[in-house]
């Protein structure tokens, strides 16, 4: 029975891998782990993070972040809007943020030192949510681990459902922590794509897309010419990125103004 389950799991993973097109027209190879299981792993990772890392006790920070998250989420495709998005603020001075499949968003308190108003915070959050809706986590797992690595992840799910023996058999040769999978650094192509998706999302939500430029200027200044903050470490060249954001912002101002005219006027802070 165990061998049959493992064979079925392996076959399902291989069959599920597929080529698709990203929001910017880039070819992606995805599907090593089915979406519902990615969502489950995202939720699991989020629970683990909240259990291991200190959460901010500042309720105004929590309310502020949730307000921005929900404003951005309202502009997502219907299937993503249907998810109950959840956010958390971690008591960590590093200017970092993330979003996970399954509708989970985490923000460090350190981000408030560089995201100095709600529009700049929206630029951070929309960028991270952009990774989720562009299936970048799925793409990274499929590319870096393939069916063999994904099988180790699914082994944990099989173990939870069918017994520890099945799970251990599936994960022979090592284990991959769900948290590690989801926090793998993105490629520069993915980061640029998340910029494009995120800047449009924030404009449609009624946040000024020009403030994305200010955010990145603040991030560069915060690095002090030394090693960039973790959030910047795998991202494209900062100056080139700012130039691209300025160009996009000009074309997105009408989208932002239309959103504001239609009543999308976030008042998160």
Task: For the regions a language model picked out, list residue spans one by one.
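A Zn2+-metalloprotease active-site environment signal
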Residues: 2-6, 17-269
